Amino acid sequence: MTLIDGKAISEQVKQEIAAEVAEIVAHGGKRPHLAAILVGHDGGSETYVAAKVKACEVCGFKSSLIRYESDVTEDELLAKVRELNEDDDVDGFIVQLPLPKHISEQKVIETIDYRKDVDGFHPINVGRMSIGLPCYVSATPNGILELLKRYRIETSGKKCVVLGRSNIVGKPMAALMMQKAYPGDATVTVCHSRSKDLVKECREADIIIAALGQPNFVKAEMVKEGAVVIDVGTTRVPDASKKSGFKLTGDVKFDEVSPKCSFITPVPGGVGPMTIVSLMKNTLLAGKKAIYQ
């Protein structure tokens, strides 16, 4: 069993990005600038945004954090999004999700200029991705592709089961795993809460990508010998022994599943760090105007 070390790979990729940024700046180019909008004080969102700001420092990017209280109006937030769309100094920006109930996440996503949508959530980026055109691919699926590549995991002709059908992970992941490229060319099945025989589907899978948000959902009897298991789940489960009062728990029951796997990602330290690195890669592309002029 090989443990896929997302933390180590993410550090490596950040160093590669930093070297490229240093080169750009040395030749008189502009330092890439990522802005983030954070609404309210959700614990998970605070943690993610802090990690993104820190990653920007390591990569040599400029970063801006714009904060609002959770009672900010939708109009106020959309006005800020439009302002960032027009700001030539900002290469890419994200609005950290989830947003408070009174704000339409979809409206916010669609208001972002797709050329600055480094999260890859805008319908134009999603559509381009689904037909294999250059675009900003959403960060978590892109991070998973990077891990498959760096560990040279064979995907062509393999049966891949994606657990979950969210717009952020499940759907794009399925589209990417069946694209005509490496990593891809897999035979993809998407399972979700309404799927029948989910256990049977998983048992036949060469690759399982679990993105349900249900702690310890994937058990040993659902995984065949030699499977590759990618765990996208990060649920905060209360744990009195931890200083924070919780433990990050994946969708896979790691201790019992890992002995059967050829490759598996841990939680934390697997997919999570790669998500942030993918955002950095998209920001670099935005700064270089590599995809959109």
From Swiss-Prot:
Q: One Pfam family this chain carries?
A: THF_DHG_CYH_C
Catalytic reactions on record: (6R)-5,10-methylene-5,6,7,8-tetrahydrofolate + NADP(+) = (6R)-5,10-methenyltetrahydrofolate + NADPH; (6R)-5,10-methenyltetrahydrofolate + H2O = (6R)-10-formyltetrahydrofolate + H(+)
Which GO molecular-function terms appear in the entry? methenyltetrahydrofolate cyclohydrolase activity; methylenetetrahydrofolate dehydrogenase (NADP+) activity
Name the GO cellular-component terms: cytosol
Fetch the Gene3D superfamilies from UniProt.
Leucine Dehydrogenase, chain A, domain 1, NAD(P)-binding Rossmann-like Domain
Which PROSITE patterns does the UniProt entry name for this protein? THF_DHG_CYH_1, THF_DHG_CYH_2
Q: What are the protein's UniProt keywords? A: Amino-acid biosynthesis, Histidine biosynthesis, Hydrolase, Methionine biosynthesis, Multifunctional enzyme, NADP, One-carbon metabolism, Oxidoreductase, Purine biosynthesis
The EC number(s) this enzyme carries: 1.5.1.5, 3.5.4.9
Read off the SUPFAM superfamilies from this record.
Aminoacid dehydrogenase-like, N-terminal domain, NAD(P)-binding Rossmann-fold domains
Pathway, per UniProt?
A: One-carbon metabolism; tetrahydrofolate interconversion
| GO BP annotations, alphabetical order | L-histidine biosynthetic process; methionine biosynthetic process; purine nucleotide biosynthetic process; tetrahydrofolate interconversion
Per the record, the similarity remark reads: Belongs to the tetrahydrofolate dehydrogenase/cyclohydrolase family.
Q: Sorted alphabetically, which PANTHER family does this protein's record hold?
A: C-1-TETRAHYDROFOLATE SYNTHASE, CYTOPLASMIC, C-1-TETRAHYDROFOLATE SYNTHASE, CYTOPLASMIC-RELATED
Quote the function comment for this protein: Catalyzes the oxidation of 5,10-methylenetetrahydrofolate to 5,10-methenyltetrahydrofolate and then the hydrolysis of 5,10-methenyltetrahydrofolate to 10-formyltetrahydrofolate.
User: Protein name, please?
Assistant: Bifunctional protein FolD
Species of origin reads Bacteroides fragilis (strain ATCC 25285 / DSM 2151 / CCUG 4856 / JCM 11019 / LMG 10263 / NCTC 9343 / Onslow / VPI 2553 / EN-2)
- Give the lineage: Bacteria, Pseudomonadati, Bacteroidota, Bacteroidia, Bacteroidales
